[in-house]
Amino acid sequence: MNSPIFVHMDTTSNVVLSRGIQAKDFQRGLIHRPNNLLLLNPASLDGEFENHTNLKVIKGSFAVEQFLQNMSKRRNNQDVRWIDFTDLTMIKELSALEISELLYLGHMKTHLHSPFFYKLQNNFVYFDLGDDLLRVYYRYIEEFYRILVPNKLLGLFTKN
């Protein structure tokens, strides 16, 4: 039996709060695959330390794919939060204000200003809130529908 799906979508800030959509659904449905990740959890054991932001990064599409696959295997109690970015050199160009916004975003799991940074060229900000609850910011909100429809809604109408 399929569990119910709950979705709250804010199209002003392009954020989706959902229950019943899992990390594996997110990972399977992505069209714009992240090249690099900046981990917003300072206690994360994954990634390499980046000294300009004092956060950890996962570099390269292969390492990111492995992280995303492992992310779907984690238990609900593990704190996963990240923002993707395109160019590693631009991390070093972030201002103190931009870094403080990233720290706020990671700590409070909500945004002060736009969660989409010009220097990072990010498409996603991802928060696993536990208890099967996700908050994801999408640069292109249509990406959420590509995750929801094939992975969840179509599954409701097919027999296992």
Over which residues does each language-model region extend?
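Structured alpha/beta or helical-core interaction and ligand-binding surfaces enriched in interleaved
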Residues: 1-160
